[in-house]
Amino acid sequence: MSEPRKILVTSALPYANGSIHLGHMLEYIQTDMWVRFQKLRGNQCIYVCADDAHGSAIMLRAEKEGITPEQLIANVQAEHCADFAEFLVDFDNFHSTHAEENRELSSQIYLKLRDAGHIATRSITQYFDPEKKMFLADRFIKGTCPKCGTEDQYGDNCEKCGATYAPTDLKDPKSAISGATPVLKDSQHFFFKLPDFQQMLQSWTRSGTLQDAVANKIAEWLDAGLQQWDISRDAPYFGFEIPDEPGKYFYVWLDAPIGYMASFKNLCSRRPELDFDAFWGKDSTAELYHFIGKDIVNFHALFWPAMLEGAGYRKPTGINVHGYLTVNGQKMSKSRGTFIKARTYLEHLSPEYLRYYYASKLGRGVDDLDLNLEDFVQKVNSDLVGKVVNIASRCAGFIHKGNAGVMVDSNAAPELTEAFLAAAPSIADAYEARDFARAMREIMGLADRANAWIADKAPWSLNKQEGKQDEVQAICATGIILFRQLVIFLKPVLPLLAADAEAFLNVAPLTWNDHQQLLANHQLNKFKPLMTRIDPVKVQAMTDASKEDLAASQTDTGGPKGNGELVKDPLSAEIDFDAFAAIDLRVALIVKAEAVEGADKLLRLTLDIGDEQRNVFSGIKSAYPDPSKLDGRLTMMIANLKPRKMKFGISEGMVMAAGPGGEEIYLLSPDSGAKPGQRIK
């Protein structure tokens, strides 16, 4: 028998500035299932994580709440730990980056990089808030877009026109923190010489450590040439001060991944059998895997391995990247109630429902995963309750009533039992490859075969026939044998179900190799329901509660703040989908635009909507004093609006525009390629 593998596993560190939501949970559940599988197989697998507890955002939120940053991160960590525990995410250690182990390791790694010549310094010019006495990151600067003139845009890109720019390009810049006009100021910054590791990274990222799609994306950055990475921030900043550089702090993304090492080192201090160097030393033979989302690939596949290489530590064995979570086919939305916090979910539904659904959809690629709430209900109810648990509930009663709960020593389906045993290597391979969806398909295929066999044998009918009781006991004992096999295969995904099944089966905690042994002449405990069906009403209550979370947060903050459009023009009352669906929006070509004699605000628009022309009066004259410039332009119109008789004629629809009025009216246009008459949906 081969020696157990030594494996260290991490998930990305959640930021200690907010609650965990179901998008976050995708990663932690994925990682936990893989770790549980390794432990079930007898491998030494250690799972560590920590809160990412540094940065300006945490400092500013703590200030706003009137508490210290240390108090804030302690409060958030308690919330995170409770959510993870109830979702059955079983960390060996959950630490914080604001810890002495992380301070020591961050300083040590920085000094090794500095002494090896991998740190550069140079002066950079940044905006500085004269009231808060702090340099401003791009997201803390707002102003007018230099390209389209839209107000209240961030310092690096415009949300309206999509333009990107430097903060110094903004017109009328303001500090988003104090509202003060920032001034430009020079500061010395420290840079990690990432280009020093170009050759190593080109080789390492193609060595099987990354999925092919991720390696291809990284290759684009490598081919474009790596740039030095700014690793410093100026005081005031919540983080670790750079050694020998008072007033200069490590950028949060330098000490965050070092938090993996710090969490493990903290665990080593409490578990003397663990050796830090055996897992992190340059010559370590242990396996090291990071599970992350695709949004932070560059930090983990470029900066992190280069830092480790430069400081004399080992590099990861693999970086396992997953996609984003969507809900009902769309980005999570607070207004739709699909931006669901972990705590909100737990208040309504069992964590194992979601664990199974994620497992059934998770492959080894980086595609996004959709949580379709209708499919979620159907799949869990059908697979777990209707297939797996159904086997035990069908068989247990006959064994208790007919043989005092003792399974007879009889296998009524040797070929089917052998098929279950033979499936174990393939299911194990799927788990190992993180292809949880394939593992679930194979397991549910076995469950289907077991249910079909039991239905064919129909012990409930046989039990009514004289002299068939021994056959009934043999059938039901075989059903329990098959159920036990399924429980073993599902244990990494459904640890609570497995524990309850172990109690019913009257066995010690099951391991993977237990699938090779069959129960015979074995006393069962009384059967209790192992899982109930999802009630769709509870799912609706969960989404309703998520909408209430949004309403509460807006109430807490007094609604939208600042000079944004929602303050000037609040959202209208909600409408249902049917009301929206009744509106027929179409692409329209402006054939001719002309002034209306005797009307100060109106233009007469002749619109082509494909197979017919419409006459529409629109109050946009103040913004378009030369209406001929609109000729030939595509716009959008409401095509099924009841014709309206006006002083100057009949208006057969309405064109769509934005803006407060006057000269600030902006006629909406579809993207290039749209054709007159096409429906907008």
UniProtKB/Swiss-Prot annotation:
Q: What is its EC number?
A: 6.1.1.10
**What is the UniProt remark on how the cofactor binds and its stoichiometry?**
Binds 1 zinc ion per subunit.
Localisation per UniProt entry: Cytoplasm
Annotated tRNA-binding domain residues = 579-681
Give coiled-coil spans as residue ranges. Answer: none
Name the residues that bind ATP: 334
* Domain of life according to the entry: Bacteria
Q: From the record, which residues define motif 'HIGH' region?
A: 14-24
Enumerate the cofactors the protein uses. Answer: Zn(2+)
Q: Mind listing the UniProt keywords for this protein, alphabetically?
A: Aminoacyl-tRNA synthetase, ATP-binding, Cytoplasm, Ligase, Metal-binding, Nucleotide-binding, Protein biosynthesis, RNA-binding, tRNA-binding, Zinc
Swiss-Prot/TrEMBL GO biological process terms: methionyl-tRNA aminoacylation
CDD domains assigned to the protein according to its UniProt record, in alphabetical order: Anticodon_Ia_Met (cd07957), MetRS_core (cd00814), tRNA_bind_EcMetRS_like (cd02800)
Does the UniProt entry include the keyword Cytoplasm? yes
Gene Ontology molecular function terms on file: ATP binding; metal ion binding; methionine-tRNA ligase activity; tRNA binding
**Where does the protein principally reside?**
cytoplasm
Report any Pfam family annotated for this entry. tRNA_bind
Q: Where, in this chain's numbering, is Zn(2+) bound?
A: 145, 148, 158, 161
Quaternary structure (record): Homodimer.
The entry's function note states: Is required not only for elongation of protein synthesis but also for the initiation of all mRNA translation through initiator tRNA(fMet) aminoacylation.
Record-given protein name:
Methionine--tRNA ligase
